[in-house]
């Protein structure tokens, strides 16, 4: 940016200019010892090769305000500019309306009125598409590698309402009966209420035939002690984002490492240190990373942790940020470590949200923005909240799946492949499922793929050997 003009204006003249060109002009002017300096945009022109280059030129104040207001490439003050801001994106009226919707949905539960759980997840929106794709993927991998020597064993962690599990078994029953007869579907749920509801589903006429093929467990994935040395498939659909990972933030007001809690039930550990911005050697961890290292090693064998943690450390450096709240997926490492120890011949299919669009509407969306638990600043944080009808807002973060994929290879020594969710569904769904995806521009009105699908990614991890 260039210093274009130097004015000797009084504060009253600046106020008159703001009335003429808009209040944003005040933020575009900076007081100096000699007057006021306007920081203006750079002009752009197109070369013969089609490249955009800039040249510095003087513009009038009126032209600058006009151009930067309506053209996002001309300046910081554009109305179309989509950069970050500290202001709340909703007005008081919109926030009050959303609060009324929340209270309307939560009041029956607070008064003891039983209401069914309404888990807003992406899988139940296109049930047939997901069940077809996951089933075809499992059947192909099973027939190529393990059939007919081993049975098909599936371990599904945090399967929600279990609808996807039942749909997968239905699909195998109708299309791959020889595989269905050798299938055992193990479902690991995190509370007894879901287990009882799922057992009631199995008593219905439609799903009663699957009762002999399903085993239900109630446990935390990080504490479940079940072991299976046979080849098996593990499904982790939106599991990593539900873990409370360790968070780190640079804070000038913290004289020592502190630990605070966000939320009464769903905890996020937040560590403060003054040394996170300094480059340190491999033998001198900064306090936050050292604490993360201790947390990760809890429950690990020392030899196993030391063997791959040096590689994980290098991945962490590329992801580390000192300017905003970030986190290390330390519980994901513990989860992968337990899979490697308790299921040594497993193949993992992991699906999770990789980024979140902050313009998603209110409580009826799969994920909504939540206010940071800091009532003194009232700043919007980058975390999101999954809203359930009979549960409080749970603070989670989008999962950096490219980082998770690298950590997965270090922890399990399996080969990992990552792709977008639309690509996975288009690759493994049947013919009518492929018609769901239309290769058109995102701005087209004929786009049939929900936008939220583009926020999800799939990680496929398989052993490097074949039986």
UniProtKB/Swiss-Prot annotation:
Keyword Nucleus among UniProt keywords: no
Catalysis performed (reactions): L-arginyl-[protein] + 2 S-adenosyl-L-methionine = N(omega),N(omega)'-dimethyl-L-arginyl-[protein] + 2 S-adenosyl-L-homocysteine + 2 H(+)
Membrane-crossing residue ranges in chain numbering: none
Subcellular location, record wording: Mitochondrion
EC number in record: 2.1.1.320
Keywords, in A-Z order: Methyltransferase, Mitochondrion, Transferase
GO cellular component terms, A-Z: mitochondrion
Pfam family, one: Methyltransf_28
Function: Arginine methyltransferase involved in the assembly or stability of mitochondrial NADH:ubiquinone oxidoreductase complex (complex I).
Protein name listed in UniProt: Protein arginine methyltransferase NDUFAF7 homolog, mitochondrial
Natural source organism: Schizosaccharomyces pombe (strain 972 / ATCC 24843)
């Amino acid at each position: 940016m260039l210093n274009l003009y130097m004015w000797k204006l009084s504060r009253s003249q600046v106020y008159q200019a703001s009335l003429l060109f808009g209040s944003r002009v005040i933020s575009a002017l900076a007081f100096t010892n000699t007057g006021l300096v306007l920081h203006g945009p750079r002009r752009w022109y197109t070369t013969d090769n089609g490249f955009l280059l800039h040249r510095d030129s003087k513009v009038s104040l009126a032209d600058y305000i006009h151009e930067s207001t309506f053209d996002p490439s001309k300046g910081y003050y554009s109305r179309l500019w989509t950069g970050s801001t500290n202001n709340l994106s909703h007005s008081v009226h919109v926030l009050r309306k959303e609060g009324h919707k929340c209270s309307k949905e939560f009041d029956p539960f607070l008064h003891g009125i039983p209401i069914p759980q309404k888990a807003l997840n992406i899988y139940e929106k296109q049930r047939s598409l997901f069940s077809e794709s996951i089933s075809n993927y499992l059947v192909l991998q099973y027939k190529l590698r393990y059939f007919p020597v081993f049975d098909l064993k599936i371990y599904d962690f945090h399967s929600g309402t279990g609808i996807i599990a039942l749909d997968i078994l239905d699909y195998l029953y109708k299309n791959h009966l020889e595989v269905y007869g050798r299938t055992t579907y193990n479902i690991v749920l995190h509370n007894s209420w879901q287990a009882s509801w799922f057992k009631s589903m199995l008593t219905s006429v439609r799903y009663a035939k699957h009762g002999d093929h399903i085993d239900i467990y109630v446990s935390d994935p990080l504490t479940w002690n079940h072991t299976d040395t046979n080849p098996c498939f593990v499904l982790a659909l939106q599991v990593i984002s539900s873990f409370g990972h360790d968070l780190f933030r640079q804070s000038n007001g913290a004289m020592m490492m502190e630990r605070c809690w966000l939320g009464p039930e769903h905890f996020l550990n937040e560590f403060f240190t003054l040394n996170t911005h300094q480059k340190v050697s491999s033998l001198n961890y900064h306090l936050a990373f050292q604490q993360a290292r201790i947390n990760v090693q809890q429950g690990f064998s020392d030899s196993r942790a030391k063997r791959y943690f040096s590689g994980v450390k290098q991945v962490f450096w590329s992801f580390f940020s000192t300017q905003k709240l970030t986190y290390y997926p330390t519980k994901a490492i513990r989860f992968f470590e337990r899979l490697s120890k308790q299921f040594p011949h497993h193949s993992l299919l992991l699906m999770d949200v990789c980024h979140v669009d902050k313009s998603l509407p209110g409580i009826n969306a799969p994920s909504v923005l939540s206010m940071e638990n800091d009532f003194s600043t009232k700043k919007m944080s980058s975390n999101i909240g999954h809203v359930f009808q009979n549960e409080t807002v749970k603070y989670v973060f989008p999962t950096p799946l490219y980082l998770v994929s690298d950590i997965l290879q270090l922890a399990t020594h399996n080969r990992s492949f990552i792709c977008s969710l639309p690509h996975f569904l288009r690759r493994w769904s049947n013919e009518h499922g492929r018609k769901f995806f239309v290769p058109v521009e995102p701005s087209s009105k004929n786009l049939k793929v929900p936008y939220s699908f583009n926020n999800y990614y799939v990680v496929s991890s398989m052993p490097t050997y074949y039986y």
